Amino acid sequence: MEAGEEPLLLAELKPGRPHQFDWKSSCETWSVAFSPDGSWFAWSQGHCVVKLVPWPLEEQFIPKGFEAKSRSSKNDPKGRGSLKEKTLDCGQIVWGLAFSPWPSPPSRKLWARHHPQAPDVSCLILATGLNDGQIKIWEVQTGLLLLNLSGHQDVVRDLSFTPSGSLILVSASRDKTLRIWDLNKHGKQIQVLSGHLQWVYCCSISPDCSMLCSAAGEKSVFLWSMRSYTLIRKLEGHQSSVVSCDFSPDSALLVTASYDTSVIMWDPYTGERLRSLHHTQLEPTMDDSDVHMSSLRSVCFSPEGLYLATVADDRLLRIWALELKAPVAFAPMTNGLCCTFFPHGGIIATGTRDGHVQFWTAPRVLSSLKHLCRKALRSFLTTYQVLALPIPKKMKEFLTYRTF
C-alpha cells in the first residue's frame, strides 16, 4: 500500500470452535500480537483459547495477487518452515497478550539457573492475561506452560514486556493496580504500582525502557519510571476513560486513545499535549444515540513512527500521518476491538467482537533522511537534552516533534 491509498483486506482468520460453545458469548478477540521478529502471530479467539499462528500465513489465507514470502524459503534464517500452529487452552477468558523480545544473554543465564528443567529461554515467550487475575507464561515453539503468575484480584487487561530482553513483565488490571514481574526469578512479583482510582485498561513500556505508561477509567494517564518504579507525572486532557496507549519507536512521543472519541499525542518527557486527533462521524446524523459511536478502542504506532492506526466504534479502521490532523486512509470493519502493526511494516492486524482477525495493507514509505536522523537522535536524547543543544530553534522544534 502506497501513502494515500485505502487499506485492502489481505486475509481473515476465523475461529474454529467446537459446537458446544455459544458463538454469541465470550467470543471476543480482545488482543492481537505479532512476535518482535515477525515469525509468529497470536490472537485471543474467545472461549479461553489463544491461537499461535506462524507468519507469514499459509497460502490458503492469502488472496491471489498478494505476494507473501514462503516459510520454506531458503532465505529463512530461523527455520520457520517447521513451525506449526498452536492452540493454547488458558482455562479463562483471555484479555491481554504480549510476546517477549528475544531474551538477552544475561537473562538466558539467569533463566537456566532458576529453571534447569524448563525449555531453553532463547525461544520466544508469550504471556496471557486472564479473567480471574492470573497470568500464564507459555513457551511459543512448543506451546508448553512455563509459569503461572498470581497476585491480581481481577481481570488482567493488558501486558507489556521490556523491549531490552530482560524478561521483566508489566501487567495492568481491573483491580486498579499494575504489577511488575521478573520471569528470571520464577516470575517473582517485584513491585505493585498503585494510584489509579478505576480499572487500568492498558500499559506500555517505552522502547528505551525508561518509562511505563498506564491508562485507566478515571480519564487519567500515568507515567512511571521503569528504574525506580515511582510516578513521574499524570497527564490530563481526556474527558472519558482512556483505553489504549503506545509509545513511538524512538520513545519521543506517546499516544493515548479514549472513549471521548479522541487520540492525544503527548511529549512524555515534558507532559506537553502536542495535538489531538478527533474521530468524528463521516456522515452527519440526527440520531442522538450515535453521538458516542466514535469511541476509541485501540491505537498503535507504525514501526517507522510516521503513522498511527486507530480502531473506533463507528466501524472504521483509520490510518493517520503524524503531521496531519485528518486520517489519510479508512477501511470499513465491524465491531473492531484492537489493532497492531506488523513489526516490519506494511500490514495491520485487527481483532473483532466475533473473534475474527483481519489483516490490512498499511502504508509503506521510505522515511526521509530528516526523519531517520530525528529518530536516531531521539532514541537516546530526552526532550530536555534536545532543548539544551546549541542548535537553531527550528531544528529543536523539528527534533521535538513540534513541527514536521
UniProtKB/Swiss-Prot annotation:
Q: Does the keyword Nucleus apply?
A: no
Q: Name one GO biological process term.
A: protein ubiquitination
Q: In which pathway does it act?
A: Protein modification; protein ubiquitination
Q: Residues in domain SOCS box? A: 356-404
SUPFAM superfamilies for this protein: SOCS box-like, WD40 repeat-like
Q: Which domain of life does the UniProt lineage start with?
A: Eukaryota
Each WD repeat occupies one of these ranges, namely: 105-148, 151-191, 195-234, 237-276, 291-330
- Supply the PROSITE patterns for this chain: SOCS, WD_REPEATS_1, WD_REPEATS_2, WD_REPEATS_REGION
Record InterPro entries: G-protein_beta_WD-40_rep, SOCS_box, SOCS_box-like_dom_sf, WD40/YVTN_repeat-like_dom_sf, WD40_repeat_CS, WD40_repeat_dom_sf, WD40_rpt, WSB_SOCS-box_domain
State the UniProt keywords alphabetically: Repeat, Ubl conjugation pathway, WD repeat
Q: What SMART domains does this protein map onto? A: SOCS (SM00253), SOCS_box (SM00969), WD40 (SM00320)
Q: What is known of its domains?
A: The SOCS box domain mediates the interaction with the Elongin BC complex, an adapter module in different E3 ubiquitin ligase complexes.
Q: What does this protein do?
A: May be a substrate-recognition component of a SCF-like ECS (Elongin-Cullin-SOCS-box protein) E3 ubiquitin ligase complex which mediates the ubiquitination and subsequent proteasomal degradation of target proteins.
Annotated protein name in UniProt: WD repeat and SOCS box-containing protein 2
Q: Which organism is it from?
A: Mus musculus (Mouse)
